[in-house]
């Protein structure tokens, strides 16, 4: 076992106050993300045309945004739909699923993380 400290072990992650506080656009909407959330070369505008678009955007928002930004950008119903498809650090799963037990589990990610 290594005593190495990784950024994933120390990086702070924010979590919104409640899922009901999430007021972002649903599928078909548009998100405008700042560089502090996503480093896109040309535009931080993401059209939520498909669940894949939402998965891409939500992964960045959950990993990088403040709780206030998460509440403004995320949509509860869309989050519940894409949560099992998100690829997140294990600490993020722990933080979010502890606070929001109604989130569906991503069994594949949890099986991998428990190794």
Each model region followed by its residue ranges:
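Long, compositionally biased intrinsically disordered regulatory segments in eukaryotic proteins
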Residues: 1-115
